[in-house]
UniProtKB/Swiss-Prot annotation:
Belongs to the sphingomyelin synthase family. One of its GO terms (cellular component) is Golgi membrane. It is a multi-pass membrane protein. It is found in: Membrane. Keywords: Kinase, Lipid metabolism, Membrane, Sphingolipid metabolism, Transferase, Transmembrane, Transmembrane helix. GO terms for molecular function: ceramide cholinephosphotransferase activity; kinase activity; sphingomyelin synthase activity. It comes from Trypanosoma brucei brucei. The chain crosses the membrane at residues 45-65, 90-110, 166-186, 206-226, 230-250, 276-296. The keyword Membrane applies. Its EC number is 2.7.8.-, 2.7.8.27. Predominantly synthesizes inositol phosphorylceramide (IPC), with minimal sphingomyelin (SM)/ethanolamine phosphorylceramide (EPC) synthase activity. Specificity is likely to be defined by residues in the lumenal catalytic domain that interact with the polar head groups of the phospholipid donors. IPC is synthesized by transferring the phosphoinositol from a 1,2-diacyl-sn-glycero-3-phospho-(1D-myo-inositol) to an N-acylsphing-4-enine (ceramide) or an N-acylsphinganine (dihydroceramide). This is Phosphatidylinositol:ceramide inositolphosphotransferase. GO terms for biological process: ceramide biosynthetic process.
């Protein structure tokens, strides 16, 4: 008999050989199935946050390499850019961009807190209380906000899942940006980088980059995939999905702020227009690809944190938010005993075991 591989077409009536096993069945109960088993959400929160810190240091080193490799501004002029030609240069708008990013960051943390309150409300924990009751403050910060028109997602653990989605998307984008800015060095259009300062202490500069998110360190030439645009678009996507569940106004407010911030980035000559456009596209695509899942991050991303020997367990146990469930099994033997007792006129009761 001629044997055919399981992926080929065999003649009618030909019995497939023993090796013709679908891939899913072939790996049933194997190592890969164990790897697909989701980690506890709390473990993912801690470990992905640790991964984000590690990626931040990788980006800080990449920024330093890019600074040293940047073309000499006195020799190489900035590239032609249509956005620069259409928009008048306003240098101080770079500060406005930083202020708007800080505003969106605070709004995102506020939204995350409100999502946590929605989770507590879903599991029946109620609203937290302050030691001293301040009517206006307590109602604003501790009350549950829910926009029913935009609430199509399960509320249990929604704050945890939203944070995992945000931090994993951000880590992936920063890691990709670290690679891109090192690969190709472009002439900078930024005013402060036309006479770039010398980095005297590289280690100190790396630490300052991580601690201040780049605001207190020296770095020039990191152009492709704008970091400002990445975080702005992440806030936009976060509020487009989760902010709308808290209050209807979050979507339009954040959208207007993000669009104006994009304008500020190009008008202040902080980045080329392509840097902004590519960052917008990549951030939206990454946030959608990571997705919202009750198991947290996609299992492929969880593979990168399973090997960590600390920061949470690898197996799921009974969570603090789980509700106890009692299951009663009806025994035929007990029913027979009850029938005998009834027929004999006995009034005793037969106790059953609860499982």
């Amino acid at each position: 008999m001629i044997s055919y591989p399981f992926f080929s077409l065999s003649p009618p009536g030909l019995v497939p050989p023993p090796m013709a096993v679908p891939p899913v069945e072939m790996y049933s109960g194997s190592f890969w199935n164990r790897m697909r088993k989701p980690l506890p959400l709390r473990t993912q929160v801690i470990r992905f946050t640790v991964v984000f810190v590690i990626v931040s240091f990788i980006l800080a080193v990449a920024l330093q390499i890019t600074h040293e490799r940047m073309p000499d501004p006195k020799v190489t002029k900035p590239l032609p850019d249509l956005g620069f030609e259409l928009l008048t240069k306003i240098s101080f708008l770079s500060v406005v961009t930083d202020v708007l990013i800080a505003f969106l960051s605070l709004l995102s943390f506020f939204t995350l807190w409100k999502l946590y309150l929605l989770h507590r409300h879903c599991v029946g924990s109620g609203e937290p209380e302050l030691p001293c009751n301040i009517p206006g403050v307590s109602r604003f910060f501790l009350s549950v906000w829910l926009c029913k028109e935009n609430c199509r997602i399960e509320l249990r653990n929604i704050h945890t899942i939203a944070w995992i989605r945000f931090i994993t998307s951000y880590a992936l984008l920063l890691l990709f940006r670290s690679l891109v800015i090192v690969m190709t060095s472009m002439p900078t259009p930024v005013d402060k980088c036309q006479d770039p300062p010398k980095i005297e202490n590289p280690v100190k500069n790396v630490i300052l980059t991580v601690l201040t998110a780049g605001g207190g360190s020296i770095h020039c030439g990191d152009l492709m995939v704008s970091g400002h645009t990445v975080i702005l678009t992440l806030h936009l996507m976060f509020h487009w999905i989760y902010g709308a569940m808290v209050h209807w106004s979050f979507r339009p407010v954040v959208t207007v702020v993000a669009i104006f911030s994009y304008y500020c980035i190009v008008a202040s000559r902080s980045h080329y227009t392509d840097d902004v456009l590519v960052a917008i596209y990549l951030t939206i695509a990454t946030f959608i690809a990571v997705g919202h899942n009750a198991d947290g991050a996609p299992w492929q991303l969880q593979l990168f944190i399973r090997w960590l020997p600390c920061c949470g367990a690898n197996s799921r146990e009974v969570t603090e938010d789980s509700q106890p469930v009692m299951v009663a099994f009806k025994s035929e033997a007990v029913d027979e005993l009850r029938e005998r007792d009834d027929s004999a006129g006995l009034s005793g009761e037969v106790s059953t075991n609860e499982v």
